[in-house]
């Protein structure tokens, strides 16, 4: 069973983050530039929240607010569910499903060391299942 640390090693463990006092517009620009759907919100070295495209849609667009004038802290999701690098992909899938999450920050010693998305987890699961199928087919064929 694959662990998060292996997933991060394969996909890269770049941490895309924004400060809580940054404008939502700047966070959106960074998400677009990095082709990601969420950013960690970090104050100093501490994870204080997460901001996603969904937060923007629901808390800025639908409320007719300005992304240039709204700080990230006003729309971010605080109290983020996190995982450690030794967590299994299955545990992450369960957390995402149970909590209706699309992104999980990875913390090691209280420091953000990466982020996994539900898409990353699905790809890893499919890859692992494909490998199992290939092994079984090889065994059957001889």
Give residue ranges: language-model regions.
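Tandem CBS (Cystathionine beta-synthase) repeat/Bateman regulatory domains
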Residues: 1-142
């Amino acid at each position: 069973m694959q662990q998060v640390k292996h997933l991060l090693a394969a996909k890269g463990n770049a941490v895309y983050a924004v400060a809580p006092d940054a404008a939502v517009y700047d966070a959106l620009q960074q998400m677009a530039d990095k082709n990601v759907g969420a950013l960690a919100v970090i104050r100093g070295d501490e994870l204080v929240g997460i901001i996603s495209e969904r937060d923007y849609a629901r808390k800025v667009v639908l409320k007719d607010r300005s992304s240039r004038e709204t700080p990230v802290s006003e729309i971010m999701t605080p109290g983020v569910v996190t995982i450690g690098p030794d967590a299994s992909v299955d545990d992450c899938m369960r957390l995402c499903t149970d909590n209706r999450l699309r992104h999980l920050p990875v913390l090691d010693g209280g420091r953000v060391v990466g982020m996994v998305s539900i898409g990353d987890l699905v790809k890893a699961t499919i890859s692992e299942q494909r490998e199992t199928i290939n092994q079984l087919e090889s065994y059957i064929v001889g």
